[in-house]
Design a protein with these regions (language model features):
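Small-residue helix/turn framework positions
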Residues: 1-42, 46, 52-79, 100-115, ...
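Intrinsically disordered, low-complexity segments enriched in small/polar residues
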Residues: 73-98
Length: 268
């Protein structure tokens, strides 16, 4: 067991090693509560181990439960018991997940439940290419925030100090309130979502740098998109409630809108 890491248990594995390739068949590993099963084949494993040359591989990955938060490094700041922010000895460490430059992997993923930060993803499926410090995602589909998302794009740490995310999202029946609850970016850019009832669909394209906590840096963000909703209601906004009381129009406390489409552009 490694310090600050969950217990690792290899339940089963069929291991084949030759000078040309390394193959793992039906390898099942439990890391704490997390499980992962992989069929994989790696080439140039000796050159990778001895000379640091590129390791090539293909992987088919399956999992019932995988909590990415268990593997995120601590950031350089921690909250003290008094509530003050204190800097620890690991000030140089960040929560950035750095993609190795000397691997070339083709991956098929089928993950039943994935947790990351405050978000939960179910039935995540798609293809990923990991190469040159970059993860390309193709038709990565998942259920989240009450609806469904399909993602295409990339995450790059070619510059490890400035990770970059470029992604296109196709959204179907996402809950406004759930998006506000789970996405820090929505809380900062669209706090009104907290008071909206209903679902939305549409598409979003975004390019942004990421900070040490893997959150978008809003000053660098660019993008566009279109969102539509067929049944939307707004309530619980204090300022609107006060106006409704002042003019004696209680029906204004809950406003309803149908068949609305919003096109938008994001600029730094």
């Amino acid at each position: 067991k490694m310090q600050d890491m969950p217990d690792v248990e290899i339940k089963k594995s069929l291991f084949t090693f030759t000078p040309k390739y390394l193959q793992l068949s039906e390898t099942t590993v439990n890391i704490g509560k997390n499980d992962i099963t992989a069929d994989s084949r790696f080439e140039n494993n000796i050159g990778y181990a001895l000379k640091g040359t590129t390791l090539k591989g293909s992987l088919n990955i399956r999992s019932n439960y995988f909590n990415l938060n268990d593997f995120m490094p601590a950031t350089g700041e921690e909250m003290s018991s008094s509530g003050d922010v204190t800097t620890t000895d690991s000030v140089s460490s960040t929560g950035i997940v750095e993609v190795p430059r000397n691997i070339d992997f083709q991956m098929d993923a089928n993950l039943k439940q994935v947790l990351f930060d405050k978000m939960s993803f179910n039935n995540m499926n798609g293809k990923l290419t990991v190469k040159d410090g970059k993860v390309d995602m193709k038709n990565l589909s998942m259920s989240t925030m009450g609806g469904n998302v399909v993602m295409n794009g990339y995450y790059s740490t070619a510059d490890a100090k400035k990770p970059e995310l470029k992604a296109g999202f196709k959204l179907t029946n996402i809950g406004f309130a759930q998006a506000y609850k789970e996405l820090d970016m929505v809380q900062k850019m669209a706090p009104i979502f907290e008071n909206l009832k209903g679902n939305f669909s549409g598409s979003i394209n975004v390019l942004t740098d990421l900070d040490a906590a893997m959150s978008p840096i809003l000053d660098t963000m660019q993008g566009d998109g279109s969102l539509s909703t067929r049944d939307l209601s707004l309530s619980g906004v204090k300022a609107i409630d006060q106006i409704a009381d002042a003019i004696k129009q209680p029906n204004l406390k809950e406003m309803k809108v149908k068949d609305m489409t919003l096109d938008f552009i994001i600029k730094d």
